[in-house]
């Protein structure tokens, strides 16, 4: 198991009954779906994406709309992984990309391990149901339940970037793969919602402690040909919660929507 005890950072052993236990006696039950909850009790309440957002994203991604990004991530992971690689998807959501990466790794005959975590319990439940071969946990990017240098390849796909934790868990020479939206991503969607649609801001690619190996762009036009697909895309974005009702109605009354899809995939190496 790639995960460590979130309380003492000690290694975890999995008992026959599924519990994960450290040498100090801290114990974590495995949920029936197969994941562990490593959010500490003092972080109670609801965290991350709610069930509605998770279901919308799952429905949208299952159409294959973001498959070019998924294939790029899989190819990049395979390029740098070995049989001994410990691969971690930080902020993996409902596990769409994590699942495809694990399947590609398996098809290649590799013994590399693929794990993921997300702060949303609803999201991790669906990820665990989708692929029982994944090691999954509820956890925060700002307090990863992983030992120092315990990750060979770390992915961050539209997740919060906690740079100190990223550097802590990534071994020297390890790879960090990060996907972000480019400037025109979903501009067609925003053009329907807002009178003055805005472009995304892309920050400087330089990150402390990491050497940039590659910067690859993915760009295409996506046509959504049903109200259900348009609704799924909208509901999985933050725009669903900060858009006036009249604009929502205007978007959701459309039968067809064309929008720009733009991503940037950065690959970094942890400096020694």
Q: Locations of the language-model features?
A:
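Class I SAM-dependent methyltransferase SAM/SAH-binding core
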Residues: 86-89, 94-143
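N-terminal auxiliary segments of SAM/dcSAM-dependent transferases
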Residues: 1-46
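Conserved beta-strand signature within the Rossmann-like core of class I S-adenosyl-L-methionine
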Residues: 174-183
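A short acidic, Gly/Pro-enriched loop at the edge of an enzyme's catalytic core
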Residues: 142-153
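Conserved Class I S-adenosyl-L-methionine
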Residues: 218-272
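Helix-to-beta-strand junctions that scaffold the AdoMet/dcAdoMet cofactor pocket
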Residues: 170-171
């Amino acid at each position: 198991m790639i995960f460590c005890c979130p309380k003492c950072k000690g290694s975890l052993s999995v008992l026959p009954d599924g519990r994960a236990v450290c040498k100090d006696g801290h114990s974590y039950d495995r949920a029936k779906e197969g994941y562990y909850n490593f959010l500490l009790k003092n972080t109670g309440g609801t965290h991350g994406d709610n069930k509605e957002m998770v279901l919308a994203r799952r429905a949208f991604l299952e159409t294959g709309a973001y498959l070019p990004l998924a294939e790029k991530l899989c190819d990049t992971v395979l390029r740098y992984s070995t049989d001994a690689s410990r691969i971690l998807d930080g902020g993996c959501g409902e596990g769409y990309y994590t699942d495809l990466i694990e399947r590609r790794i398996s098809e290649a005959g590799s013994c590399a391990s693929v794990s993921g975590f997300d702060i949303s319990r609803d999201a991790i439940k669906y990820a665990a149901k989708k692929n029982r071969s994944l090691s999954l946990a509820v956890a925060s990017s700002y307090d990863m339940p992983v030992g120092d240098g315990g990750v060979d390849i770390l992915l961050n796909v539209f997740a919060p970037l906690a740079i100190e934790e990223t550097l802590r868990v990534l071994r020297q020479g390890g790879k960090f793969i990060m996907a972000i939206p480019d400037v025109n991503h979903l501009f067609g969607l925003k053009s329907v919602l807002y009178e003055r649609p805005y472009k995304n801001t892309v920050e400087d690619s330089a990150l402390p402690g990491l050497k940039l190996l590659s910067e690859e762009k993915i760009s295409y036009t996506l046509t959504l040909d049903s109200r259900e697909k348009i609704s799924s895309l909208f509901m999985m974005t933050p725009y669903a919660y900060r858009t006036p009702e009249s604009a929502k109605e205007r978007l959701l009354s459309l039968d067809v929507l064309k929008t720009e899809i733009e991503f940037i995939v950065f690959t970094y190496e942890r400096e020694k």
